[in-house]
Each structure stands twice: as C-alpha cells, then as structure tokens.
Design a protein with these regions (language model features):
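Conserved catalytic core of the tyrosine transesterase superfamily
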Residues: 1-268
Length: 268
C-alpha cells in the first residue's frame, strides 16, 4: 500500500536497520548467534538536507551582528564587561567567518605567521592537512591588524606554546572550539532576537558566506573553490536556497515600471 511505501523511505529504513543491527549484535555477543551478520548489511544512503532546511543569517541580521560586536548593543552587563576586553578579537573572528566561510577548526588554527600582509594573503589549514593561500581583503586585513595591534596580549605575557596563536582567550591561551562556538552563538542570538541557546553555530556562518556569495553573483564553481566543498552538489544546495533570487533581481531591474526603484529614478 501507499502507507507501506511511504514508511519505507531511506530514513525509515536506516532507523530499522539500526534497530536490527543492535539486536543482532546483542544476540551475537550473548552466544545466541554463531556469526555477526551485521557486517553484510548494505549501507543505506540518506538524502542530503533540502535547500529550505539550510539555516543562515539574512543580510540585515549580519549587519545587526556586526553592530553588536562594534557597540555592545544587546549584551548583558556581565557580557559587556567581557566584551570590553575582547571586542576587537570577536569582530575579527566574525568578519573572517562571514567573508571566507571558514570551518571552525580552520579559524581556530590560524596563527599570526599565517598572515603575510605585505603580499595581501593568508594561509588556511584545510581538512586532511591541505594548506591553501587565500587573498585577504581590506576589511579582513583591517580587523585582524586592529586586534593584533591594540588588543592581543604582548608576546612577553604569552606562554611559548601559544606565542603564534592568533586568537587567544583572556587566559592568554589559544581559544578552544567551544569558546569560539559560544562566542558565535552569543552574537548571532542577539542579531536574530532569540535566546542565547538558539544562537547559530559557526557552520551557519559558513552557510551565510556561501549563500551571500552566490547572491552577489559568483558562480557555483567559484564558491565551491573558496569554501573547499568536496562536491559541487553541496554548493548547489546553497544556490537552490536562493533559487528565486534571479527572478527578484530581474523584476526590480525594470526601467519602465514606475513601482520599481529604477522606474522611479527614471521618472524623477
């Protein structure tokens, strides 16, 4: 029946397979089965998330987030005390995330020596030990330099192990993944006007960078290269998320319709 077909989609099958695997492994460990037969189960391929499931910040939310880190708006008194000591660091972290779509570990592993400002580039340490030189734009160069020059602790105060680490905690150690994640959650939650626990992860800022680049007009293959996606189908998810963008642009790019911005300008 249709009901049976519906219930046996790949997600349902994966759940059922998991339950059976647990049962058979239990029986095997207890000597009730001679062989562990779960090794012969065929893998079940689960579908990639649908485009409408992609969560990211909208442009106005990015603007709000950057305003928060700039001015401290929306922070509690306790958060503001902390922010006064880390605002340049926090700003540099957020700007790098939304510009380059860095993975959490890629940002965490950045060193001062990763940056060559005279050549206008910096080194990213990708997955699987891959190193990639990336051009640094003016905004990113400015926020990173401001942090290094005006807020980062002096070398004499930093332990040998963390001398080269770019982003340091107040304890003068390389920031942990958790502290970076909490930082991003805090600022994004204020931007989205939600509770701190519902703030976004660094991966959502990666999604924000990808969709924003595609909206700006960069090709899927350019974005794939910048984001280091293994497969272009991953990048296409972000493009599909904004599938109506071209229609919106074209409808607004209308010289003859008096209700569009261009039409109004022409008739002024």
């Amino acid at each position: 029946s249709d009901r049976v077909l519906y219930e046996n989609n790949n997600k349902s099958l994966a759940r059922k397979k998991s339950s059976l695997s647990t049962l058979f492994k239990f029986l095997y460990r207890n000597g009730q089965l001679k062989d562990d037969i779960t090794g012969g189960f065929n893998p079940i391929k689960l579908p990639k998330p649908q485009p409408d499931a992609i969560k990211r910040l909208e442009i106005d939310e990015v603007a709000t987030m950057l305003d928060v880190v700039e001015n401290g708006n929306g922070l509690t008194d306790k958060e503001k005390d902390y922010w006064l000591k880390t605002k340049l660091r926090d700003k540099a972290i957020l700007v790098l995330f939304i510009t380059y779509g860095l993975r959490l570990n890629e940002l965490r592993e950045l060193n001062i020596s990763s940056f060559n400002f005279s050549r206008g580039e910096f080194m990213i340490y990708r997955k699987r030990g891959k190193e990639v030189l990336m051009p640094i734009n003016e905004a990113c160069e400015r926020v990173v330099k401001d942090y290094i020059d005006y807020e980062r602790p002096k070398s004499s105060d930093i332990g040998e192990e963390d001398q080269d680490a770019l982003f340091l905690s107040l304890q003068k150690k390389r920031m942990t993944s958790r502290s970076i994640r909490d930082l991003v959650k805090k600022y994004t939650s204020i931007a989205m006007k939600t509770s701190r626990d519902k703030g976004y992860s660094p991966h959502k800022l990666r999604a924000t960078a990808a969709t924003s680049l595609i909206e700006t007009g960069f090709s899927i293959y350019d974005v794939q290269n910048l984001m280091d996606h293994d497969n272009v189908t991953t990048t296409q998810l972000y493009a599909a998320h904004r599938k109506n963008l071209k229609r919106d642009i074209v409808e607004n790019f209308n010289w003859l319709d008096e209700d569009t911005p261009l039409g109004k300008k022409r008739n002024d």
